[in-house]
């Protein structure tokens, strides 16, 4: 029996846009992602799948059914977000901003927020949506769930980001994270949500995987993410505005709440192809991970010609680690290259070049990377950690029981090394809308019938239930702490 500390959280994470729609009255047409996946040009060119989120699992209308199943599995924690476009479907009066902050890369040092301004915002909020979020959170709280309330999971109100115009090279409209106004608006939104729902939240996250937003949106057009405009310069602008937005949202939440505030980041574990590629690992980690966290923990920046910005320093109480697979790198003139055949660059339902099985998404089974990521964060920053997402696209549920046990084992291994890991939240409780890939990728412990909205337990849900009941990995499940046996091909 591999036991976890008393009070350790076992739960699940989910996204509003991916899970909420699917029942009458649940559609939210006012976000950039909603516009993006409905765009005919995107669908015809296969930038997106053509699946539509309004046909989703229906959490908005059936949340109690989801919570019932989570209770049966024995979960005690959840990360859930409030959709910005539901609360403020129309623009707020433009805030008073410092000179120059309508420009794409102007510094945002502070955002003036007080109760009078929050009450003014209250006049513009969609109180029907806010009341429904309160009902959802109250139901979770009444069942004893630890609630990590997240402010942002990739969607922006359409009045802040018109991705179709940006995709076409038209920057005269709302440009999202390319404009400092979004930094101000995000701080205001975060303060407002905390002001209205603080009695129900256990703690807060400002954002989930912001690095995917600036990366997939501007640097990796094959991902199919808005605005799908290839520009490394714009990617850097979006990154710095997001860094500022986190810091200003942290301050905004702290102005109305005493609860802890973290951020959740998309992580891979970098491995060298050969020993001489260790420098490539260091470069990849610095560019893709440490540059972001050094900004919001140490205040260190480089793009504005100064070493430290005090308004960014110490704006973090804990770190949320999302991990799915690794990345293998090698040295290159540009610093490093990622190699196909490993990590998330494999053939679907096949074998990686390391002879490890891959998922429905083509992601390599590699649990040791989670331990490595946790250890590196802990050694560098010493802040409490949560595993906030970890899961696998596996409709048949063949690999998921192995994936679940072997990754939770790596968390236990990190705990034994003295790493302060406070919870493991699986992605996800139920199948949902996988962004540009639509409904084809199924990550759920529960299988969703999208026509009837019924939920069916997969075997992995039973495995997770045994772990939560034991607060650890019981001996009878330890045989799953391994790479899944490779299934023979049928002739």
From Swiss-Prot:
What is the superkingdom listed in this entry's lineage? Archaea
Q: Which reaction does it catalyse?
A: Hydrolysis of terminal non-reducing beta-D-galactose residues in beta-D-galactosides
Q: Which SUPFAM superfamilies match?
A: (Trans)glycosidases
Instruction: Write down the InterPro entries for this protein, in alphabetical order.
Output: Beta-galactosidase, Glyco_hydro_1, Glyco_hydro_1_AS, Glyco_hydro_1_N_CS, Glycoside_hydrolase_SF
List the GO molecular function terms: beta-galactosidase activity; beta-glucosidase activity
- Catalytic residues as annotated in Swiss-Prot or TrEMBL: 209, 389
Keyword Transmembrane part of the UniProt annotation? no
Q: Give the EC number(s) under which this enzyme is classified.
A: 3.2.1.23
- Thermal effects: Thermostable.
Keywords, ordered alphabetically: Glycosidase, Hydrolase
On whether Hydrolase is a keyword of this UniProt record, the answer is: yes
Enumerate the Gene Ontology biological process terms: carbohydrate metabolic process
Annotated PANTHER family: GALACTOLIPID GALACTOSYLTRANSFERASE SFR2, CHLOROPLASTIC, GLYCOSYL HYDROLASE
Record family assignment: Belongs to the glycosyl hydrolase 1 family.
Protein's recorded name: Beta-galactosidase
Taxonomic source organism: Sulfolobus acidocaldarius (strain ATCC 33909 / DSM 639 / JCM 8929 / NBRC 15157 / NCIMB 11770)
């Amino acid at each position: 029996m591999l036991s976890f500390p008393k009070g350790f959280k076992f739960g699940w994470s989910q996204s509003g846009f991916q899970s909420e729609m699917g029942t009458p009255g649940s559609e939210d047409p006012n976000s950039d992602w909603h516009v993006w996946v409905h765009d005919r040009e995107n669908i015809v060119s296969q930038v997106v799948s053509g699946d539509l989120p309004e046909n989703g699992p229906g959490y908005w209308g059936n949340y109690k059914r989801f919570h019932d199943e989570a209770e049966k599995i024995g979960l005690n924690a959840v990360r859930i977000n409030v959709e910005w476009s539901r609360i403020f479907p129309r623009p707020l009066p433009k805030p008073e901003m410092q000179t120059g902050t309508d420009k794409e890369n102007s510094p945002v040092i502070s955002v003036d927020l007080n109760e009078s301004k929050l009450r003014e915002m209250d006049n513009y909020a969609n109180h029907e949506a806010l009341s429904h979020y309160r009902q959802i959170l109250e139901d979770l709280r009444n069942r004893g769930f630890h609630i990590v309330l997240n402010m942002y999971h990739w969607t922006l109100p359409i009045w802040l980001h018109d991705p179709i115009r940006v995709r076409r090279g038209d920057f005269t409209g709302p440009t999202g994270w390319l404009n400092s106004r979004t930094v101000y608006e995000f701080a205001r939104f975060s303060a407002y949500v905390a002001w209205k729902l603080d009695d129900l939240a256990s703690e807060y996250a400002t954002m989930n995987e912001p690095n995917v937003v600036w990366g997939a949106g501007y640097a990796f057009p094959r991902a199919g993410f808005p605005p799908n405009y290839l520009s490394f310069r714009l990617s850097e602008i979006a990154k710095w505005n997001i860094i500022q937005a986190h810091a200003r949202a942290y301050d905004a939440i702290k102005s109305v709440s005493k609860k802890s505030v973290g951020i959740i980041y998309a992580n891979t574990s970098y491995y060298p192809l050969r020993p001489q590629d260790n420098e490539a690992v260091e470069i990849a980690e610095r560019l893709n991970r440490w540059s972001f966290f050094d900004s919001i923990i140490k205040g260190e920046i480089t793009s504005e010609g100064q070493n430290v910005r005090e308004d960014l320093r110490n704006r973090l109480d804990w770190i949320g680690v999302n991990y799915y697979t690794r990345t293998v790198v090698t040295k290159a003139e540009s610093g490093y290259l990622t190699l196909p055949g490993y990590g998330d660059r494999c053939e679907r339902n096949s074998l990686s070049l390391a002879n490890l099985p891959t998922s429905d998404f083509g992601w390599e089974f590699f649990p040791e990377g989670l331990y490595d990521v946790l250890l590196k964060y802990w050694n560098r920053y010493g802040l409490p950690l949560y595993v906030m997402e970890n899961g696998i696209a596996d409709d048949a549920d063949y690999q998921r029981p192995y994936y679940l046990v072997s990754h939770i084992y790596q968390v236990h291994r990190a705990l034994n090394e003295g790493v302060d890991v406070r919870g493991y939240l699986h992605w996800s409780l139920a199948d949902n809308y996988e962004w540009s890939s639509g409904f084809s990728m199924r990550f759920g412990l529960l299988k969703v019938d999208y026509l009837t909205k019924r939920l069916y337990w997969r075997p992995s849900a039973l495995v997770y239930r045994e772990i939560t009941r034991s607060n650890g990995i019981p001996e009878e499940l330890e045989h799953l702490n391994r790479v899944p046996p490779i299934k023979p091909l049928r002739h």
